[in-house]
Amino acid sequence: MVTSVEPIRLGARRSPLARAQVALVSAALAARGVPSTFVGVTTRGDVDSRPLSEIGGTGVFVGAVRDALRAGSIDVAVHSLKDLPTTPAEDLEVAAIPEREDTRDVLIGCRLADLRDGVRVGTGAPRRAMQLLDWAARAGIDLEVVPVRGNVDTRIARVSSGEVDAVVLAAAGLRRLGHLTEVDPAETDTVVSSLQAEILDYRVMLPAPGQGALALEISRSLSIDRRAAVAALDHPTARAESLAERGFLAALEAGCTAPVGTRVVVKSVRGTTLDLTLTAVIGRTLVSNLSEPPKADPVLRFEASGTSPKPWDFGVYQAGQVLSALPDPPRPRR
């Protein structure tokens, strides 16, 4: 328990989703007798409305929050893990990755079976656009993917207003905001804000590395008692799966907006050794030296399994397997 009477200051963006995520962390701390308070931070991604790929998507939602950590105005930064750059900050550390939310994506506005030629689907993520277009090509459908940004409610409103026919959003964010109610695991049809929706199967849409996970980042100089209070929220399985996914992404030298979808599952644990499976989909645009891919196969798919005591290293190794199998592996980006 934190011995100081001062509450732990939780810093995050001011968006409704960020606040909801802070509320979850605050409740988890309170359950352990640890008081906390919210400190809002405005990030570059909040004030620049351009597509993330244009403003340098890596870290645009976390830079200002990290600066607040370094300045000592907050004790803990509450991030969506997928937004964190894979390159670690030497003066900061992720003290906890709490239990992970649903890692799937949700199509809002219609079901996959309802998609037809000319349907406009909104997303701001190259990963989602890549997989949507790949699915549509295999289904013989000519979809139009429309770039959209904004918070969850803003993007849902674009469907209600008719600006787009559907949008794709993360199930985790929808659940944390109370927009997505529980459904039978065998069912994928649901309703979001009175709109028809479908929870997408992993065979259609793989998540971003770390999707659905929170990262509780602290300064390495944080006091021992506060560090311990935060570390108590760590979930070993969530950490292992997320680290493996992010190791895979890092080894591909891809930023967090790169067209890479990855899912790692811890199948079993034997002592300190983890039995892991990895499934990935990679946009060919990431592999710049690869010759023109066949039209029937616009993305690279990869599956692997193995054992390792170090999830990050497992992800790095599997990315190496992908790159070594390419006919002309790309040179590292400078």
Which stretches of residues belong to each language-model region?
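A conserved helix-loop-strand patch within extracytoplasmic ligand-binding domains
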Residues: 81-84, 88-143, 214, 223
